[in-house]
Amino acid sequence: QTSRRSGVRAARRSARSAPLPDHLKPVRAGMEGGTFSPLNKFGMDRIHQAVLDALETIGLSQAPQTGVDYLTAAGAKLGDDGRIRFPRALVEDTIARANRSVTLLGRDPRHDMELSGTRVHYGTAGAAVHLVEADGRQYRDSTLQDIHDAARIADVLDNLHFLQRPMVARDIADNLQMDLNTIYSCCAGTTEHVGVSFTEPEFVRHGLEMLHLIAGGQDAWRQRPFVSNSNCFVVPPMKFATESCQVMEAWIAGGMPVLLLSAGQAGATAPAPIAGAIVQATAECLAGLIYVNAISPGHPAVFGTWPFVCLLYTSDAADDLLCVDLGGRRII
C-alpha cells in the first residue's frame, strides 16, 4: 500500500511538472488583444492630419544619398534645405499598399508569428549594457554568454514568443565580431524569431553569410528569414540616422524583415505634450515605411513607434510606458 501511494504521489508530481498542452497554456502566441481607446475618432483624425502636415511641411533631414534617390523616385520632394518632404498622396498611397500581413518566422515553424489583426506577441527587447548578478546583487558588464543564456531562457518560457537581443556583448571590443557573435549566440540559444541590430552597413554581408550557413543556403534563408533588423533609422526629432538607414537598405536587399524604431522622448527630443510626441513618432515611422516600400514594395516592415517621456527634473527617460497604436487595437 505504501508503495502504491508513493507511486501515486510520483505520478501527480510528474503531471504537475509536465508542460501544458498548447490549448491549456494561459498565454499563447497570437492571442487576440483587447481594446484601449484613449482617443475618439475626432482625436485620432486630428493626430492623423497633424502627421500628414508634419511630413509634408517639415519632413526629415540627413538621409543618405541612396535614401534621397529612393525617396525622390517614389515621389518625395528634396528641398533646398536638404530635407525630404512627403506629399500627402505619397503617404496615403504607401499606407494603402504596405504589407499588412507580416509573418515573422522562427527557425522552428511552430514559433512563426502572424502579426495581422489584433494578435499579440510578447518578447524580450532593449540593449542593456549592465547585468545585476543574482548572487551579491552587483552590477557588471553584460557579456556574450549572458545573451546566449537569455536566449536559452526565452526559448523555454511559454510567455515569450520572440527574442530581441536583450543585452550588448561588452566583452567583445570589435564591432564586427560583436555583431556576428550576437547573431550566433541568439540563434544558438533559441529557435524563435530573433531581432538584432548591426553597427555598420559594411558588416551586413558578413551577417548574411552567417545566416545563409545557419539556414542551409541563401535560398533557404530567403524562403524563411528567421532574423529581423531592429533599426533605429531616425534620430528624433525628424532626422534620419544616416548609417542606420544604410544598414536597413543592405538588410532589405538581403531579404531581412525590418522593425522601424522611433524612440523620441517627450520633453527632450519630442514635444512635451503626449499628443505631440505621438504625432512625431508616427510621422517618423511613416517616413520609414515609405523608405522601405520605395526600396522594395511590400517588404515586411513593422511599425515601431516607441515614444518615451523625459523626466524633466532628472533628464532620465521614463521607459515603463505602454506603447499603444492609435486605432486602439492592441497594447504592446
Region locations from a protein language model:
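Hydrophobic alpha-helical segments, chiefly the membrane-spanning helices
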Residues: D325-I332
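Acidic/polar, glycine-rich intrinsically disordered N-terminal extensions of enzymes
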Residues: Q1-Q145
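Flexible, glycine/charged-enriched surface loops at secondary-structure junctions
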Residues: S61-D69, D80-G82, H161, A220-R224, ...
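Conserved small/polar residues in nucleotide/adenosyl-binding loops
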Residues: Y313-D320
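Acidic, glycine-rich loop-and-beta core segments that form the ion-binding/anion-interacting portion
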Residues: V247-M248, I252-M256, S262-F308
